[in-house]
């Protein structure tokens, strides 16, 4: 699809790595595409694409004593996306602090530019994950549809990323514990006491612990408190929520947040493969 601005044709494409869930309307919009990560559970490779079966995946993870692993899309996969016809090409990746996807996309950009040096390509390090990537992709489309030039759009979206914070509470901490993502807070997680940490992204895109509570419901209440405290400028922002197999819990979180703050819109999505691996059964992720 192309739009005419000032007499010129402008088209764009956005590649999200598959940690970023796509809404139904994004899936129907051929300007968006997903670059699949590969998940490995007990020696079995599972492609994180439209064939991903969350319930089956969660069963396999629960039954496997080893931590599931993920492998990012190859530079060649990103290069293929960047070689498609479009005036402006973008990728949105999982936080570079958590995955090699960003570096792979940068390499893919460089490969594409060797063949097409005039292409305009930018890689956005989401410094987030899951629905955080979704919101960034939607921001790109909003800016493109408003007719922004490439450099202004990149600056606008990077500032939007700066303003984002990702919050999450997990019912099941096994994956994060096993793969060392939560090494700094291992000592604080006492499963016998049902202590659930309230987690958030750092400005650099790493994971930190904000708080903890006994039981997931109390932890979710604390998470909502932190979101309400940090909600400056929320009237102009979209609230993104993703959940792993717990739609009712996500709805309760959404309603609790909307009782406290005003937002432009809300999207609620079920986690795809990579996010399901980290959120695990019962996890809720909120991005604002």
Where are these regions (language model features)?
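Active-site cofactor/cluster-binding pocket
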Residues: 73-89, 93-115
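N-terminal glycine-rich anion-binding loop in soluble enzyme alpha/beta folds
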Residues: 13-72
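A ubiquitous short alpha-helical element
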Residues: 93, 120-127
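Conserved phosphate-coordination/catalytic loops
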Residues: 69-76, 214-217
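Mixed-charge interfacial surface used for oligomerization/domain docking
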Residues: 3-13, 19-33, 38, 98-101, ...
């Amino acid at each position: 699809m192309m739009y005419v601005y000032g007499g010129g044709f402008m088209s764009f494409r956005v590649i999200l790595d598959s940690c970023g869930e796509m809404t139904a309307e994004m899936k129907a919009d051929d300007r968006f595409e997903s670059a699949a990560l590969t998940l490995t559970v007990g020696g079995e490779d599972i492609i994180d694409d439209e064939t991903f079966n969350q319930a089956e995946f969660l069963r396999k993870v629960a039954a496997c004593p080893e931590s599931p692993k993920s492998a990012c899309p190859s530079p060649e996969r990103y290069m293929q996306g960047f070689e498609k016809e479009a005036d402006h090409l973008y990728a949105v990746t999982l936080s570079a602090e958590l995955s090699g996807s960003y570096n792979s996309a940068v390499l893919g950009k460089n490969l594409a530019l060797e063949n097409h040096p005039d292409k305009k390509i930018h890689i956005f390090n989401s410094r987030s994950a899951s629905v955080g990537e979704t919101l960034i992709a939607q921001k790109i489309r909003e800016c493109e549809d408003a007719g922004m030039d490439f450099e202004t759009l990149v600056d606008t979206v990077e500032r939007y990323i700066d303003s984002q914070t990702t919050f999450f509470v997990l019912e099941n901490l096994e994956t994060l514990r096993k793969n060392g993502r939560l090494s700094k807070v291992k000592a604080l997680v006492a499963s016998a006491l049902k202590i659930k940490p309230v987690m958030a992204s750092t400005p650099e895109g790493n994971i930190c612990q904000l708080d903890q509570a006994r039981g997931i419901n109390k932890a979710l209440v604390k998470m909502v408190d932190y979101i309400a405290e940090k909600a400056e400028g929320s009237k102009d922002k979209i609230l993104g929520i993703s959940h792993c197999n717990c739609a009712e819990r996500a709805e309760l979180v959404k309603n609790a947040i909307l009782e406290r703050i005003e937002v432009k819109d809300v999207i609620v999505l079920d986690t795809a493969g990579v996010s399901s691996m980290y959120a695990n059964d019962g996890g809720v992720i909120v991005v604002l």
